[in-house]
Amino acid sequence: MKVLWAALLVTFLAGCQAKVEQPVESEPEPELRQQTEWQSGQPWELALGRFWDYLRWVQTLSEQVQEELLSSQVTQELTTLMDETMKELKAYKSELEEQLSPVAEETRARLSKELQAAQARLGADMEDVRSRLVQYRGEVQAMLGQSTEELRARLASHLRKLRKRLLRDADDLQKRLAVYQAGAREGAERGVSAIRERLGPLVEQGRVRAATVGSLAGQPLQERAQAWGERLRARMEEVGSRTRDRLDEVKEQVAEVRAKLEEQAQQISLQAEAFQARLKSWFEPLVEDMQRQWAGLVEKVQAAVGASTAPVPSDNH
């Protein structure tokens, strides 16, 4: 695809200098080489190539072109191709900006500013081409029925100059995009280096551990088992000693708690007996007094009842 496109561009550049009635010398060979050098097949470059191919057709100034120039079809086609080119260019720029994330902010801002300037120049020159064609269409319409040979020659000259400017703009844009891409590659390499620096100590530690395990694997199995048994025995003895010490501490604490509880129970019993004796000393006089009063009241009631039941003397005797 790239070879076919390069061949198409060479053919286009070779025919861009043709006039309608008089032959014109072809473009210099260095300019052809310049275009084929930067043409790398990126989507935005392919879109720009389609724009140039359409411009080459316009530069022939054939009868069909002249008829379509009197309408708005040519400018509409150029507008579509311009929009397509700028859209692909923005997409490619966004892709490179994502790859530039590891690069320093200052560097990324500078590269982005330079690329935007080159992109703006390319867009302005493409707009200039369309403006020239619109101007030519207006002049042709104003000169209907008159000779337009001089006007066509002037338009052809303007279009050749604009094509050279577009070629320079595209070359500059391609170079800046290459710088952009190189910056993205450099940032990615720095990110990989940083990861390598962080992982280096971990890899070294793993290597040391592997060497230690390898040296242990070289010992006889019986010696390693004996060493592990001794370490396990020492560990078990240490745990047993700590457990016994802890049990002794718990026993002492339980004995202390029991003694405190017995002491508190005895104190509570003594306090209850004292309180009971105090209550008894308070209420016994009251009870005895109430008993005496009750006995006196009972005697009075009995005396009153006996007096009311005595026989009354009769007056009939």
Curated annotation (Swiss-Prot):
It is found in: Secreted; Secreted, Extracellular space; Secreted, Extracellular space, Extracellular matrix; Extracellular vesicle. Pfam families: Apolipoprotein. APOE is an apolipoprotein, a protein associating with lipid particles, that mainly functions in lipoprotein-mediated lipid transport between organs via the plasma and interstitial fluids. APOE is a core component of plasma lipoproteins and is involved in their production, conversion and clearance. Apolipoproteins are amphipathic molecules that interact both with lipids of the lipoprotein particle core and the aqueous environment of the plasma. Glycans are attached at residue 212. Keywords: Chylomicron, Endosome, Extracellular matrix, Glycoprotein, HDL, Heparin-binding, Lipid transport, Lipid-binding, Oxidation, Phosphoprotein, Repeat, Secreted, Signal, Transport, VLDL. Heparin binds at residues 162-165, 229-236. Residues 266-317 are annotated as: Homooligomerization. This is Apolipoprotein E. Residues 158-168 are annotated as: LDL and other lipoprotein receptors binding. Sequence repeats lie at residues 80-101, 102-123, 124-145, 146-167, 168-189, 190-211, 212-233, 234-255. Residues 278-290 are annotated as: Specificity for association with VLDL. The modification Methionine sulfoxide is found at residue 143. InterPro entries: ApoA_E, Apolipoprotein_A1/A4/E. Homotetramer. May interact with ABCA1; functionally associated with ABCA1 in the biogenesis of HDLs. May interact with APP/A4 amyloid-beta peptide; the interaction is extremely stable in vitro but its physiological significance is unclear. May interact with MAPT. May interact with MAP2. In the cerebrospinal fluid, interacts with secreted SORL1. Interacts with PMEL; this allows the loading of PMEL luminal fragment on ILVs to induce fibril nucleation. Residues 210-290 are annotated as: Lipid-binding and lipoprotein association. APOE exists as multiple glycosylated and sialylated glycoforms within cells and in plasma. The extent of glycosylation and sialylation are tissue and context specific. Glycated in plasma VLDL. GO terms for cellular component: chylomicron remnant; endoplasmic reticulum; extracellular exosome; extracellular matrix; extracellular space; glutamatergic synapse; Golgi apparatus; high-density lipoprotein particle. The modification Phosphoserine is found at residue 147. GO terms for molecular function: amyloid-beta binding; antioxidant activity; cholesterol transfer activity; enzyme binding; heparan sulfate proteoglycan binding; heparin binding; identical protein binding; lipoprotein particle binding. Belongs to the apolipoprotein A1/A4/E family. Residues 80-255 are annotated as: 8 X 22 AA approximate tandem repeats. The keyword Lipid biosynthesis does not apply. It comes from the Eukaryota. Residues 1-18 form the signal peptide.
